[in-house]
Amino acid sequence: MKFLQSFPVILAVFSFAANLVSSKLVYEYETKYVTVEIVTIVSGETTYTTERLETNGPTSTTTTIVIPSSKPSSPESKPKSDSQPMFQSPSPVQITPSTTSINNAPSPTKPETTVTASPAVIAHTSVFVVTPNSAPTTSSSPPNIVQQVKAAITPSAPKPQPQPQPQENNSGTNDDSQLSSFSRQILEAHNIKRASHGVNPLTWSNELYNYANKVASSYDCSGNLRHTSGPYGENLALGYSSGANAVSAWYSEGFNFGGAGKLNHFTQVVWKSTTQLGCAYKDCRAKGWGLYIICNYQKPGNIIGQELANILPLIRS
């Protein structure tokens, strides 16, 4: 924004010329008529003021001749030059920017995250039993777990009688004499139970043993049992002092021949179509458990729809 003010001012500008003509001083006076304009400029919060000269009248010249007495006297003052306009630099103006204070701005809210745990899905293809011989010394309570694929049956097995601990190494490998002792014991225990039902005895399979031994070697003695879901029939046990005691616990589950019998550890032990056996173990007594025992069967038993042909009743006690 501009504000313009103008008023006439007579500015006398003298041009001095001193010439010596016939021992005389000649003075010439020049008069100019100008107009002074004061311009005010407002820009935002800053104001500027300037002055501008403009010539708006005729110029007159007056000549005066003076005869000096002895020495020419110097003029009292030197005339001002009229070539430069008058201009006043604007004074600096400090502008303080306005600020806005926000005191009640809401703090950002951290989004809440809800995590919903999905239930674990565990698939079992065979059955297994965990029944300890005695309460582990390092566990708060002894395990008493029975799980299987087709049915869950709580066995009423009698407490196994204390027997000498097997001397085999943890996985049942490397020492043939110890391995054969364990394999003979558990194979014999199977065949005694099978003979009571009039089915053929099982034979030992190195292929099944190697499979079972691989699983036993990797067991962590945690007290949790999980089936391998392999191509063979499978029974698991934990907490027993020998393979024979584990077989007795499996067999004690029994089968209801007069009604809707359920497939379990017993039915796999006496399954008629099964012909081969391979078992291995790991010693978990150092962690408060007994032996971890795994037995694999070929052909696998517990096949739904084949119960009548493969589960025969007891013929002798």
From Swiss-Prot:
Chain residue ranges for the region called Disordered: 52-116, 155-179
Keyword Nucleotidyltransferase: no
Keyword tags: Glycoprotein, Secreted, Signal, Virulence
Family: Belongs to the CRISP family.
Domain SCP per the UniProt entry, residue ranges: 187-297
Any one GO BP annotation for this protein: sexual reproduction
Induction conditions: Induced in hyphae and up-regulated during oral infection. Expression is higher in white cells.
InterPro entries assigned: CAP_dom, CAP_sf, CRISP-related
Gene3D superfamilies, per database record: CAP
PANTHER family noted in UniProt: CYSTEINE-RICH SECRETORY PROTEIN-RELATED
GO cellular component: extracellular space
Low complexity biased stretches: 58-76
Coarse class of the protein's main subcellular location: secreted
Glycosylation positions in this chain: N169
SUPFAM superfamilies per record: PR-1-like
Gene source species: Candida albicans (strain SC5314 / ATCC MYA-2876)
Biased composition (Polar residues): 84-116, 168-179
Entry's localization field: Secreted
The name this protein goes by in its record: Probable pathogenesis-related protein CaO19.6200
Phenotypic consequence of gene deletion: reduces capacity to damage oral epithelial cells.
